[in-house]
Amino acid sequence: MHKSLLYLLLLSTSVLCFGQSAKDEAKMTDCIKQYFSKYKAKGTRLAQQPRMLSYQVDDNEKTLTITADEWFAMQEFTPDITEHIYKKIKGELPKPYNKYKVSIITNGMTIEELIPNRLSKNADKSRLWGNINYDGKPWVKNVSTPFYPTHGLQNRHISLWASHGRYYDQKTSQWRWQRPKLFCTTEDLFTQTIVVPYLIPMLERAGAIVFTPRERDWQTEEIIVDNDGSKNNYIEVTAHGKWQTTPQPGFMKHEGNYQDNENPFMAGTARMANTTSSNKRYSVATYQPRFQKAGRYAVYVSYQSLPNSVDDALYTVWHKGECTQFRVNQQMGGGTWVYLGTFEFDAGYNEFNRVTLTNQSSHNGIVTTDAVRFGGGMGNIERFGQTSGMPRAIEGARYYAQWAGMPYSVYSGRQGTDDYADDINVRSFMTNYLGGGSCYMPNLEGQKIPIELSLAIHSDAGYFKNGKDIWGALAICTTNHNEGKLNAGISRMASRDLADALLSNEVLDLKYKYSTWNRRELYDRNYSESRVPEVPSAILETMSHQSFPDMRYGQDPNFRFTLARSIYKTLLRYINDQHGTSFIVAPLAPDNFRIEFKDKNTVHISWNAVNDPQEPTSKPSGYLLYTAMGDADFDNGTYVKKTSYEVKLEPGQTYHFRVSAVNRGGESFCTEVLSAYYQPEATKTVMIVNGFHRVSSPAVRDNDDEQGFDLNEDPGITYGPTLGWVGRQINFDRTQMGNENGGLGYSDEELQGRLIAGNDFNYVRTHADAIAATRKYNIVSCSNEAIETGKVNLSRYAAVDLLLGLERNDGHSLNYYKSFTSLLQTALQKYSQNGGALLVSGAYVGSDMTTDTEQQFLASVLKCRYAGRSQAGSGTVKGLGITFNYWNELNANHYAATSVDILQPVKPAFTAMQYADGQDAAIAYKQGNERLFVMGFPFECIIDRQKRFSIMQGILNYLLNN
């Protein structure tokens, strides 16, 4: 009986414990579910609420393992965020589970594992390159520059591309864009405006060698000089080392278009010669094209990589009389186009515009040579009887890959049946094909180029219905592939670290600069561009092209610079961290650029350093001063330690200068171009002032009813030329936001494929050439900043030529631009009242002056009043006995003043020029000490050069001859 009672007691206790345990676990389950239902990620906007998938309790080990869905993995993980998650969830668990060790698994990993190496206290060495490192010669190196970075991206090879591009759609039997035409662009064009003018140059100025699987040159002309079929343009000279035909086939172009599976690099021959170390007797191959148009052309060389190829083949590019030399490692990358650089070339056929290759080398071996290509050109790949009719640069990578000699399997895995899918895959396939056989992809066959990182720059879809909030950025990686390993054996988590860094730093940098941006998800999913590359890779969806608040930033060139610099800095840090090396961020461009005479024929050139408050290491340690004489191109620069330099001028020769800042991390972008001229007989000096620094999006419409960009009101002005416009926006109706068929932002296509000139920052040169043509005056120049900060005293000069271009405070630009700041007004008023002669020209001289004080300045100092805008279609002006035209329509040659000021004289000033419709275009005034000539359009926009010269001579005669 006692045994029975004991048994019943134990049984009842067990049942009670089990019941209590079940209740506790049910309560725990509710707590976990409630935690996830209310969870808000810190710093990340998740499109979907994360949820718990399952949990596992081990009462013996006192552990609780929670498995969450993939959305939980998409947020940012830092040590602090991870610690907070565990602290919060344990605080909500009932007893006894709040004392258990909790672990959260999402996407197959603990959240601790999702902390990137750069933030982790215990870095995961499997994600690092370790002892894998390329220390041979780079694929291409400019050996003419006086400066090389040592703590940047030197000898690092990167594969980088802008998304999408024009493609042939087999389903509709037409060429089309891969993404919709919204807000005057399409993703196929928009992302190039980040990558081409900003990101690639930043990386290259830090020392990187950048491969891009889409054509990078927006030049629509293309000239190919080849040993096959270019009799007058290709010349061989044999002095030491005979030129012979290589055993492998080479490039040869045929007339007409190219069909599927045609490889131009298998159609011809290439040449080779044994090397020599002699500096006196060597053999040369010369490629001298006939340029139909002067302009900027990318230069691509090609060759064969043979067993005894050398790593230091010497190429020289002669560009408008200057020469720049490159060493090319021909042991890699044979049988394709190899980019050297982009240069200015004259029209015509002469020895000052050519490329040469010698057989000089420090090694015994051979150099090989094949075709040389100048310019990006037009698409020439025919699909089902049609070419795109567009510049090659805006086509998809599939077509460039064929033109670049890639195997058929690389660019047409679908055997010509699906160009859309092939274009997605070819970017990564090219990366692997070129990088195969290098230390970073040792188990692939390929061209041995040590590409160690792959990055795709995209924009995304999505918007908020309120039309106000930023949609933001998203990044993508793929870790669950090939057992989580890349080709060299390192963990694919290296790609997640890259994607996380890109996303985190974009948000950090944009918030710092503009006080707003959104971090969206970090996808770890199966995307071709993040799965296929056998090196760390990521896709960065920079913003939404469907969201007007995003694109209001995205269409501003200053924003694109900031975004590109953020990406560059991320790659700089990431690549150096992967190798355990230190790095320095490249500096920003100098400001307050100015040139003044020190004595009669020596100029003092000076500038100021600009520090980046975000980057303490980016301070300049020196500068490169670039010089061009007359119509020649700029030289390769002179290294200057200080912020000034003196140059002795040759009489009668115009000099043009620009400056960049350098440090051990790399080189900044350049300043604007300034000019100087010494005329021994001159008794007067003209100071040219550059007041045109504006880069801007088109005019913005943003109200309760409308959103978008109005190119007719103001097309804005890009940094240099652009291929980024598809057409004018048609639909501004906010109620049609998100409508896929012609909804808000829908745009026309009249501008697609058209190169549109922007602000080249070289208009002082245009003014200087016109003044120098008079042969009467000395010339110096400065930025308007140098006047506003008191670094230049205008009283020293007989005349001031203030060029304002399209400068104005437009109300929507992210940077502040003003034709006449209060400081500049004060300086000009003082100068004019003290007898200085003043020439002012610009499209917004009057219309940018809106306050009573500003209009008083117009009337009292510039002797004019603003009388409206002129949009006379002809762009014709009459004045000084000359009828001439100015650039007033968007074009490839020069920025356009599409709308200009009507300036009426304030008596006793008088009308000096008129537009075709009879409205006043310029005023002149001379009385007492004051002498003025004010133009309502930019002088540099006058199309005819000789008429520019005559007009400038007439203006200066009026201003300076008593």
Which residue stretches match the model-derived regions?
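Non-catalytic propeptide/linker segments at domain boundaries
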Residues: I66-A68, M74-R176, V355, T369-M390, ...
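Aromatic-Pro/Gly-enriched surface loop or interdomain linker
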Residues: I194-A206, R214, F384, V673-A798, ...
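Active-site-adjacent mobile loop/cap segments within catalytic or ligand-binding domains
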Residues: P264, T275, R354, A371-G379, ...
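Short beta-strand-plus-loop segments that form exposed binding edges in beta-rich domains
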Residues: V355-I366
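Active-site microenvironments of hydrolase-like enzyme catalytic domains
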Residues: I394-R492, D524-Q546
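Pro/Thr/Ser/Gly-rich low-complexity, intrinsically disordered linker/stalk tracts
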Residues: R573-T617, P651, G665-K684
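Beta-strand-rich modules
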Residues: E646-E667
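A glycine-rich, often tryptophan-bearing local segment used as a flexible ligand/cofactor-contacting loop or short
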Residues: L802, L806-M913, K947, I951-Q953
